[in-house]
A protein has these predicted regions:
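N-terminal, polar/charged subdomain of small-to-medium soluble alpha/beta proteins
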Residues: 1-103
Length: 103
């Protein structure tokens, strides 16, 4: 599974990159064979003003199905990424029930 991380007005440290990759690999491991790739977007909405403004946007590209997009905003990128990964995992678990069969 390919994971691409993009930032906007946010600093991507090596620790944060490693945390994101490990967290997503763990959360999405069960559905890994259906995933073409994941694009992670990190942005600091208010810049240096502070507050709950760290956004993590996930776009999960699936084989033969439409993409899944999940977005979380928290005070910290680690927390936002954890919540987004959990939501993506739950969404993927529900997805086969609603998807039509693809030849």
């Amino acid at each position: 599974m390919k994971i691409a991380i993009q930032t906007r007005d946010a600093e991507l440290t090596d620790d944060l990159r490693e945390h994101l990759e490990q967290r997503l690999a763990f959360a999405l491991s069960r559905c890994q064979n259906r995933i073409r790739g994941v694009v992670v977007g990190l942005s600091d909405i208010n810049g240096s003003k502070g507050g709950i403004d760290k956004r993590c946007h996930l776009r999960i590209r699936l084989n033969g199905l439409s993409d899944i997009a999940v977005e979380e905003t928290e005070a910290d990128f680690d927390v936002a990424a954890n919540h987004a990964a959990d939501r993506a995992k739950r969404t993927l678990a529900r997805r086969p029930r609603y998807a039509r069969d693809i030849p």
